[in-house]
């Protein structure tokens, strides 16, 4: 699973995800992409599950790019522990995703295969997503 090698701080504020994505909103590598339509924290496990779903759907052909990285440590307190006594220890890593952000990109596969792969990946993610194509026309994805 993805996680940073080294961080400046061990724990992070919870924070809120405001506004739309400024960068990472257009296809840079592949012909097809999966775009986030809602703000949410996506965990490293969810990213890995979506990556596996895409890899299985495309049957090891084409190329996949992961455009998000889990760089926020999410801490939680153990079960049945009273409030106070400091913040819990970091449990997992997450990526803060804003609407409009490209999550995954695919190239070297036909449109219908890419659409199927992204639909399967979307089921593993906690947000609404949209399949986009470099041509801007997604009518050939339904074929």
Swiss-Prot record:
InterPro entries per the record? Ribosomal_uL16 (IPR047873), Ribosomal_uL16_bact-type (IPR000114), Ribosomal_uL16_CS (IPR020798), Ribosomal_uL16_dom (IPR016180), Ribosomal_uL16_sf (IPR036920)
Q: Which cysteines are joined by disulfide bonds?
A: none
Q: Which Gene3D superfamilies match?
A: Ribosomal protein L10e/L16
Could you give a single Gene Ontology term from the biological process aspect? translation
Family under the similarity heading = Belongs to the universal ribosomal protein uL16 family.
Indicate the quaternary assembly: Part of the 50S ribosomal subunit.
Q: What does this protein do?
A: Binds 23S rRNA and is also seen to make contacts with the A and possibly P site tRNAs.
Q: What is this protein called?
A: Large ribosomal subunit protein uL16
Source species, please? Sphingopyxis alaskensis (strain DSM 13593 / LMG 18877 / RB2256)
* Gene name of the record: rplP
